[in-house]
Amino acid sequence: MIRIKYSGLIVFSSKIFSIFTGLIFIVLVTRNLSIIEFGVWQYLSLILSYVIFPAGLIPYWVTRFYARGYPVAKASIISNMIVSLPFFTFFLILAPFASTIININLSLFYLISIQIFLVYLSTSLEALALARKPHLLGFEAFAFESTKIVLALILFTILKLGLKGVIATVNLAYLMQCLTLIFFLRKELIKEEEFNYKILKKWFSSIWLPLFNALPAFIGGLDLFILAALTKSASSLAFYKVASSVAAVISYSLSTSIALYPSLLKGGERRDVEEALKFFLMFAVPMSFGAVFLAKPILHIFKSDYEKASLLLFFMAPQLFLKSLTHIFGDVIVGVEKIDEKENTSFKDFLKSKLFKWPLLNYFRNGIAIILTYIFASFALTYFSNDFSLYAAFSCLLANIIADIFLFIKGYLTSIKAVSFNFPLNKLFKYCLASAVMVIALKFLNPVKSLETIFTIAIGSIIYFLCLFSIDFESRIIFKKVFTYMKKFNLWE
C-alpha cells in the first residue's frame, strides 16, 4: 500500500517539475526561433504525431501481461520496434511531399524521424515500468525534462543552432529517457526468458482492441474543429486552450494513483481503490479550489487579454476534477477484467468484456459532446453578438461538462459493481475544509503580477497542508510512512 503511494508521489512530483521545465523550454524556444521557424516545428510535430500514434498499441497488452508475471520484457521491445519500421518508412516516403506544402528543408524531416524509434522504444519500456515499478515513470520524466533544459541552454544560447537545435534537444532528451528506463529495468531485461510467440500472436491478433480504446481521444478533439468552423475565428480556440492548459494541471493529480491499475491486474482489492482515491483527492481538491479562486491572476501570467477566460476556468476546473475521477473509475473497470488471461479468447469474448464496453462508453461521451457543441455554439453565435468568441468557447465547455457528467455517473456505477469500494466522502470533506482555509488566505494576499501569483500559489500549498495535517491524523501518518519508505528504498534496484 505504501509502495503505491510512494510511486504516486514520485510521478506527481515529476509532473509538477515538468510544468516549470516546460515553461522554461517554451520560453527558450520562442525567444530563439522566429515565428515561421516555430510554426515549422509545430508542423513537423503534427505530422510526426500520426506515425507515433500506434506506439501505444502493443504496450497496452504488455502492461496487463507483465503485471501478472508473464516474462514478456524482450517481446515487448522487439515487437514494438518491429511495429515502428513501416511507420518510419511511411514518414520518410511522405517527407518530400509534406516538405513542399510550406517549403521546409527536407533535412529537418530526417532529423526529427529519429524520434520515431525513440518514442516506440520508450513507450514499450514505460509499459514494463508501469506494470511492476510505476515510480520509474517519475524518474524518466525527471531525466527527460532535465536533459531538455540543459541541452536547450547549450544548443540555443551558446551554439545558436536554431530549429535544428530544438529537434536535436528533444531527440537527445528522449534518448536519455530510454537510457534511464533501461538502467532501472536492466535486471528484468537481461534475464533469460523464452520468447513466447503465442503471446506475441495474441497481441497482434487483438491489436484492434487498444486501437478501439485509443480512438476516442482523436474523436474528442472534433468539438474544437466544430467551434473553429462555426466561429471562423481563432479567438474562441485561444480562450478555450489557455483555460484548459491551466485546468489540465488538476489532472496531474492522477499520477498519484498510477500504481492502482497494475495493482488491480495483480489481484488488488477494494482497499487499494479506496486508498488511491484518498491520495488523489488530497492533491486534486486544493488544485481545483486554487484554479477557481485564482483564475484571473493565473491567466494574467499568460497575458492580460486572457483574463476574460476566467469564466471558462471557473467551470473547467471542476470539470477536470470529475474527468480525473472518471479516469480512476475506468482503471478499476478494466483493471479487474480477466478475460485476456484465457488462452483462446475469441473476438466475441472481447466484445462482451469490460475492455470493450468501457471504451464504447467513451465513444458515446464524445458523441454527446460533439452534438451539443454544435447546438450550443450555434445558439451562442445567434444570440451573443458581443464577446461571441468567449461565449462560443463556453458553449463548447458546457457541452463537454454535460458529456463528462454522463460518463462520470456511468463510470462510478460500473466501477462499484466491479469492486465494491466506498467513496471516501469523509476525507473529501476534510480536503475541502483545508482548501477553503487556503483560499481565504489567498484572497487576503490578492496577487496581481505574475511573480506574485506564483509566490501566492506556493504559500497556498503550505497553508493547505498545515491545515490538513492539523485536522487529519491519517494524512500525517501517510506522509511519514512514505518518506520512511523512501529512506529504506534502494534507488538503484
Task: Give the residues covered by each predicted segment.
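Membrane-proximal transmembrane or re-entrant/amphipathic helices at the cytosolic face
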Residues: 420-427, 442-493
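Interhelical loop/hinge segments that connect adjacent transmembrane helices in multipass membrane
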Residues: 1, 109-110, 135-139, 163-169, ...
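Alpha-helical transmembrane segments of multi-pass membrane transport and lipid-handling proteins
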Residues: 20-23, 56, 77-103, 111, ...
